[in-house]
């Protein structure tokens, strides 16, 4: 079982949005409208951790170790969207995604064998990086 050790490792490097980000040093005047819009689109895209997690839990129902890990993965992945939305709330509040915009990325993936589900996500992450 990998989850207990993974939990310890990930817990040790957890970051806090309020204390680990130097919000007061940000200069909103340096952000272009195009950059702010890109931040909004990324915040919406990152929100898709929710349907991805639902897919992983569904397709890996028989693997409690992996499903337990997904609880940490989802928490950390969702923070990506939240920190981008917090940035917008502070510096471009008119661009904070609406609940409807966030709901629009909640879609169902077709059921697939567990390894195919994982590869789909892994390939997507590599493509984005």
Feature-to-residue mapping (PLM):
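Non-heme di-metal
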Residues: 1-129
């Amino acid at each position: 079982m990998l989850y207990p050790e993974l939990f310890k490792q990930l817990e040790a490097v957890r970051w806090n949005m309020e204390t680990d980000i130097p919000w007061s040093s940000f200069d909103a005047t340096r952000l272009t409208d195009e950059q702010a819009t890109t931040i909004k689109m990324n915040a919406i895209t990152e929100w898709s951790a929710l349907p991805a997690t639902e897919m992983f839990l569904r397709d890996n129902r028989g693997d409690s170790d992996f499903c337990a890990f997904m609880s940490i993965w989802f928490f950390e992945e969702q923070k990506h969207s939240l920190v981008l939305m917090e940035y917008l709330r502070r510096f471009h509040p008119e661009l904070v995604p609406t609940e409807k915009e966030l709901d629009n990325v909640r879609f169902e993936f077709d059921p697939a064998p567990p390894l195919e589900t994982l590869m789909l996500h892994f390939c997507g992450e590599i493509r984005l990086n």
